[in-house]
UniProtKB/Swiss-Prot annotation:
The name this protein goes by in its record: Ubiquitin-like modifier-activating enzyme ATG7
Extent of motif GXGXXG motif: 331-336
Domain of life: Eukaryota
GO biological process, one term: cellular response to nitrogen starvation
Keywords: Autophagy, Cytoplasm, Protein transport, Transport, Ubl conjugation pathway
Keyword Mitochondrion included in the entry's annotation: no
A single GO cellular-component term on record: phagophore assembly site
InterPro entries associated with the record: Atg7, Atg7_N, Atg7_N_1, Atg7_N_2, ThiF/MoeB/HesA, ThiF_NAD_FAD-bd, Ubiquitin-activating_enz
UniProt cross-references to NCBIfam families, sorted A to Z: E1_like_apg7
Organism: Saccharomyces cerevisiae (strain YJM789)
Primary residence: cytoplasm
SUPFAM superfamilies: Activating enzymes of the ubiquitin-like proteins (SSF69572)
Length: 630
């Protein structure tokens, strides 16, 4: 009896979770799972041939590919199916009854095992992902169960059977998805069959332990299923097969026969939670904030709050169409600064500033992208650089350019022609154009060019205690009537409004909060409009899409208006579009120097003559009537 001993077991695996595993878990949580905390499948391929000599168990490596349904395995690797339960709240993770949870997973393995003994092996991970701090709490469990009657009380070492071990190793290499095999009456290795093993009483198990003469705890699962299949089995030969050296054989004895052989829900002892690095039965915590690329963290963090909108509030919100929109900001002043900050908060990645001014000493307190040290430097380039400091992955560009203005005579035709060409090229390159410049006449040429290129225009303009935010209508609109642009209410062509102005007229004198209100509404109007392009309908998950928003701070009121395009509009009427198409820069040059030329082309001059004639006719009629009465 001195050679008899109680059979002990080693832990089944030692887990190694790669950073890519947590990155993929983060992506799935944000983009796919959201509030879904149900079981998600995992797949691992075990390499039983290349186990480090210092390891006591087979490493269980989990990477981003572990989430793939078709996880391509290499030669000699053993596929293992598992699952992960990612909780929404840290307290749910902490308060989970871990033993009950593992017992439930063990019952699932048991039910699979009595159908196919090779299916009684699995693993499970419980986790919580703190996506703001990049801290991940997790605990690996490998359900190992043992029925009281299947306890192996005494084992007796069997002399080395190298030839048999070699045959088993080769069989497992070919049958890579199998965990057990048996010997038949002819001493041939065959698939597990309870009728055969009842007679031969030889069971071979693929092992994941490297400890000398100590099998992994997974052995308990196979022995429990074996005794369920052969309830009267007491003595048998157990072969522990390792792909490298270390295989051994035992003459084993069950504690007793199985009185519960017909029970599908047996009394079982369950273990399998992995110990942490301190050797305690407790979860592990991984802080990836110091390991990941800061730029990668910034990129994911920028999108975090936006993606959380889709979890519960706006599941149909299309964030990609916003992120991929290229935005051109004409004006890098107060409006341009606030609009750009709202755009990057919505996830826009491509912004181009156009401005020809420099930062004055009065600007930094009202224009959020500039500091005192920036005074005297070009606005456009500084605004772009400031956005990149806020978010280094931002594709921000600054272009110093003077927009040719109607009513302002040409000073340097060659330079202004180049500015015109550059402006038109910029409008072609971008998807949405924001008009955020100071003067009315500087909005005319961008409005015309955007209409020519069928670009979406968002216009924002400020008064002292009022603001206007509007979207321009396009020629390709599906509706029967085209919406008006910024100039559709004009009865005269824009003229020079900058010359001979006093200081209070030259500076933008507004209540400080007006610019913030107009800027935020302009960006929100853009995001709502983009959702209609995605859905193809007038309704949007973000609500209404007004044409014009006029706000008045003196009584804190807001009006939503809609006006059609004006047939004599100096910026978007068909005659103006046709003239520009035919003449190009020559048309623009004439309009810049002679605003009345634009009135003639658009038909405003004829309209004014008709109105004047109508007025004369009315006065003549009144005179005739007065004569008759007299």
């Amino acid at each position: 009896m001195s050679s008899e001993r109680v059979l002990n077991y080693a832990p089944a695996f030692k887990s190694f979770l790669d950073t890519s595993f947590f990155q993929e878990l983060s992506r799935l949580k944000l983009d796919v799972l959201k509030l879904d905390s149900t079981c998600q499948p995992l797949t691992v391929n075990l390499d039983l041939h290349n186990i480090p000599k210092s390891a006591d168990q087979v490493p269980l490596f989990l990477t981003n590919r572990s989430f793939e349904k078709q996880n391509n395995k290499r030669t000699n690797e053993v596929p293992l199916q598992g699952s992960i339960f990612n909780f929404n709240v840290l307290d749910e993770f902490k308060n989970l009854d871990k033993q009950l949870f593992l017992h439930q997973r063990a019952l699932e393995c048991w039910e699979d095992g009595i159908k196919d003994i090779n299916k009684c092996v699995s693993f499970v991970i419980i986790s919580f992902a703190d996506l703001k701090k990049y801290r991940f709490y997790y605990w690996l469990g490998v359900p190992c169960f043992q029925r009281p009657s299947s306890t192996v009380l005494h084992v007796r070492p069997e002399p080395s059977l190298k030839g048999l071990f070699s045959k088993c190793q080769k069989w497992f290499d070919v049958n890579y998805s199998k965990w057990v095999c048996i010997l038949d009456a002819d001493d041939e290795i065959v698939n597990y069959d309870k009728c055969i093993i009842r007679k031969t009483k030889v069971l071979a198990i693929r092992d994941t332990s490297t400890m000398e003469n100590v099998p992994s705890a997974l052995t308990k699962n196979f022995l429990s299923v074996l005794q369920y299949d052969v309830p009267d089995l007491i003595d048998f030969k157990l072969l522990i097969i390792r792909q490298n050296e270390g295989s051994f054989a035992l003459n084993a004895t069950f504690a007793s026969s199985d009185p519960q052989s017909s029970s599908s829900n047996p009394d079982m002892k369950v273990s399998g939670w992995e110990r942490n690095v301190q050797g305690k039965l407790a979860p592990r915590v991984v802080d990836l904030s110091s390991l990941l690329d800061p730029l990668k963290i910034a990129d994911q963090s920028v999108d975090l709050n936006l993606k959380l909108m889709k979890w519960r509030i706006l599941p149909d919100l299309n964030l990609d169409i916003i992120k991929n929109t290229k935005v051109l900001l004409l004006g890098a002043g107060t409006l341009g600064c606030y609009v750009s900050r709202a755009l990057i908060a919505w996830g826009v990645r491509k912004i181009t500033f156009v401005d020809n001014g420099t930062v004055s000493y009065s600007n930094p307190v009202r224009q959020a992208l500039y500091n005192f040290e920036d005074c005297g430097k070009p606005k456009a380039e500084l605004a772009a650089a400031s956005l990149k400091r806020i978010f280094p992955l931002m594709d921000a560009t600054g272009v110093k350019l003077s927009i040719p203005m109607i009513g302002h005579k040409l000073v340097n035709e060659e330079a202004q022609h180049k500015d015109f060409d550059r402006l038109r090229a910029l409008i072609k390159e971008h998807d949405i154009i924001f008009l955020l410049v100071d003067s009315r006449e500087s909005r005319w040429l961008p409005s015309l060019l955007s209409n020519i290129e069928n670009k979406t225009v968002i216009n924002a303009a400020l008064g002292f205690d009022s603001y206007l935010v509007m979207r321009h209508g396009n020629r390709d609109e599906q509706s029967s009537k085209q919406l008006g642009c910024y100039f559709c209410h004009d009865v005269v062509a824009p003229t020079d409004s900058l010359t001979d102005r006093t200081l209070d007229q030259m500076c933008t004198v507004t209540r400080p909060g007006v610019a913030m209100m107009a800027s935020s509404l302009a960006v929100e109007l853009m995001t709502s409009l983009l959702q209609t392009k995605y859905s193809g309908s007038e309704t949007t998950v973000l609500g209404d899409i007004p044409h014009q928003i006029r706000g008045f701070l003196h009584n804190f009121s807001i009006l939503k208006l809609e006006t059609p395009a004006y047939e004599h509009c100096p910026a978007c009427s068909p005659k103006v579009i046709e003239a520009f198409t035919d003449l190009g820069w020559e048309f623009v040059k004439k309009a810049l120097e002679h605003p009345l030329y634009l009135e003639e082309i658009s038909g405003l001059s004829v309209m004014k003559q008709e109105v004047e004639q109508l007025g004369n006719d009315v006065f003549e009629w009144e005179d005739d009537e007065s004569d008759e009465i007299a």
